[in-house]
């Protein structure tokens, strides 16, 4: 029952979160900082009340270690959201971030000197090729759509290229953070709720560096058309409503993944999260009518095939089906 509940939270929370994020960035592409700040503040407040008992509970992992992790987490979160201001379409944003498993594996080989099976190396190639196809096709669209004059087209392309560089850096930084987190958990034990709180609480002063951008977007949000909130009946600017729903659904998504990790094997968690990403991509393409060519579909399919190959989901399906048939015969 808990597993079904967690899967529901993941699909409903994470998919709707992407919808509200896209509603925000379509009108204000540079609103990534205020979105990140709102998400961090909400999760930090919830953790302060329920995890640290209003600051009375001491951390199990030394704060000095959290400072290193938080610096990486803050950088990744800000860059990922800020990249949307560089002509990066939401579908490409999602596909690019699907390479996180592979980035983790590459850094694992370089830093931890890990060795993997041939199927894992094949998955690296597949995901890399898939992301490359989608990126090249998106580059062509940037040239076509933004190129009013040759100079405008070059500027738009360079702007987009900077966004791609930001996503690549964030992907590798996120993988490095994952390795660092793994070493901390081995040394001090798993304290995911605690890590979630400190990862969102400690970076809050860092948003002072982005305060001007956050304030400007808060003003713009307040000037958006009013709407009546369903059920409650209160009226509020539509962009503030989208931001509120984005924050709430982000929390539901995170909680769903957390429950899932305590109830299921890591393979199941990865499969659920991968399927969720694919569904989010479909929603983004169909509902928001984002440009998506046949080559984009090919690239997406290759990315997800590589991800499933990496997690050994494909090879485990026949074994699971065989076990199911044996159980049926025993009955």
Curated annotation (Swiss-Prot):
Q: Does the keyword ATP-binding apply?
A: no
Q: How would you describe this protein's topology in the membrane?
A: Multi-pass membrane protein
Spans traversing the lipid bilayer: 5-25, 30-50, 59-79, 92-112, 122-142, 153-173, 201-221, 238-260, 267-289, 301-321
Protein origin, superkingdom: Eukaryota
Q: Does the keyword Protease apply?
A: no
Q: Principal localization?
A: Golgi
Q: Name one GO molecular function term.
A: UDP-xylose transmembrane transporter activity
One Pfam family recorded for the sequence: UAA
Q: Which family does it belong to?
A: Belongs to the nucleotide-sugar transporter family. SLC35B subfamily.
Identify this protein by name: UDP-xylose and UDP-N-acetylglucosamine transporter
Q: What is the lineage of its organism?
A: Eukaryota, Metazoa, Chordata, Craniata, Vertebrata
Name of the coding gene: slc35b4
């Amino acid at each position: 029952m808990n597993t079904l509940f967690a899967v529901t939270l993941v699909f409903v929370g994470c998919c709707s979160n992407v919808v509200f994020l896209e509603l925000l960035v379509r009108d204000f592409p540079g609103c990534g900082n205020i979105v990140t700040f709102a998400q961090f503040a909400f999760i930090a407040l919830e953790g302060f009340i329920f995890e640290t008992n209003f600051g009375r509970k001491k951390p199990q992992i030394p704060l000095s270690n959290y400072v290193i992790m938080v610096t990486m987490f803050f950088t990744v979160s800000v860059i990922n959201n800020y990249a949307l201001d560089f002509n990066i379409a939401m579908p490409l944003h999602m596909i690019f971030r699907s390479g996180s498993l592979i980035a983790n594996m590459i850094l694992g080989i370089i830093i931890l000197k890990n060795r993997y099976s041939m199927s894992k190396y094949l998955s690296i190639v597949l995901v890399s090729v898939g992301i490359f196809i989608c990126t090249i096709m998106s580059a062509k669209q940037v040239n076509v759509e933004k190129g009013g004059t040759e100079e405008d087209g070059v500027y738009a392309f360079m702007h987009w290229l900077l966004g791609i560089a930001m996503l690549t850096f964030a992907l590798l930084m996120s993988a490095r953070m994952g390795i660092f987190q793994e070493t901390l958990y081995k040394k001090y034990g798993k304290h995911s709720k605690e890590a979630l709180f400190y990862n969102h609480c400690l970076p809050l002063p860092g948003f002072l560096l982005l305060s001007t951008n956050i304030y400007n977007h808060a003003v713009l949000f307040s000037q958006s058309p009013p709407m009546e909130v369903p059920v409650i009946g209160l009226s509020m600017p539509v962009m503030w409503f989208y931001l509120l729903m984005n924050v709430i659904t982000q929390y539901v998504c995170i909680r769903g993944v957390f429950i899932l990790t305590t109830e299921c094997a890591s393979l199941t968690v990865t499969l659920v999260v991968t399927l969720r990403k694919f569904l989010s991509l479909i929603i983004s393409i169909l509902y928001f009518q984002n440009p998506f060519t046949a080559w984009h579909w090919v690239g997406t399919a290759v990315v997800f095939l590589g991800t499933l190959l990496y997690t050994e989901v494909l090879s485990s399906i026949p074994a699971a089906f065989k076990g199911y048939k044996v159980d049926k015969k025993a009955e």
